[in-house]
From Swiss-Prot:
A motif (Nudix box) lies at residues 176-197. It is found in: Cytoplasm; Nucleus; Mitochondrion. InterPro entries: NUDIX_hydrolase-like_dom_sf (IPR015797), Nudix_hydrolase6-like (IPR003293), NUDIX_hydrolase_CS (IPR020084), NUDIX_hydrolase_dom (IPR000086), Pre-Nudix (IPR040618). Monomer and homodimer. May contribute to the regulation of cell proliferation. This is Nucleoside diphosphate-linked moiety X motif 6. PANTHER family: NUCLEOSIDE DIPHOSPHATE-LINKED MOIETY X MOTIF 6, NUDIX HYDROLASE RELATED. Belongs to the Nudix hydrolase family. GO terms for cellular component: cytoplasm; mitochondrion; nucleus.
Amino acid sequence: MRQPLSWGRWRAMLARTYGPGPSAGYRWASGAQGYVRNPPVGACDLQGELDRFGGISVRLARLDALDRLDAAAFQKGLQAAVQQWRSEGRTAVWLHIPILQSRFIAPAASLGFCFHHAESDSSTLTLWLREGPSRLPGYASHQVGVAGAVFDESTRKILVVQDRNKLKNMWKFPGGLSEPEEDIGDTAVREVFEETGIKSEFRSVLSIRQQHTNPGAFGKSDMYIICRLKPYSFTINFCQEECLRCEWMDLNDLAKTENTTPITSRVARLLLYGYREGFDKIDLTVEELPAVYTGLFYKLYHKELPENYKTMKGID
């Protein structure tokens, strides 16, 4: 099997397509015609990374010589590389472009590359190399928001807020967007503290709402998860920028009031049912399990499973 295109072969293609160019021991000259001597790149050589699906990843941030390359030369070199990858039977190209090298986006787009996603300091473009429509997976399809229903069982009070920047101020649970690699329960605890000053502990997941074409998610789909939290402090010190009001409200009152959203009303009634009949009837508890990827773990949320069913001891 032929090896993925290395930076040395990439430079050779650029040289063939753009005119006489650098061989080993030369680099692009900055602000001058021609080339100047430079030690071989050696350890800085970079091959496009071949993934298990036959795709090639090219990370321009690792190719220092591109800082002195113009867009036209890059386009010709990329075109030659794409032709080679097609001849090798590769499935796709993933082109990672740092924001400061964005001048290479238009040349790539002219060759058929499309945006896949962008981060704060880079963008990723893709090109499907096989026949037929692209089978590459899309980027993240959902935004994840998490709220905390902080319920004090001793007083039957629940913590609620009114957002400052809403057209209609209604009672709701404090919450916000989950951060990258942040567990659902941790998001709920963090958001509650940031908005209200109340410290709490994650107990369970109560509900999951899925909404498509959500204006608050840039028109994408949105997952809104409400967690049951147990309070460890009770003095409210709410964020004046985010919240108009914040208080401990009787759970019965929240379940009956019309001054709330449908989801808040439904979860309040769910909590009331759990308080009276047992939280085991409403809680989705969490357990950490090993992932199929070595060294990684995940959190699984489900109704409580008796220990003998977890171990299957004594189960026929």
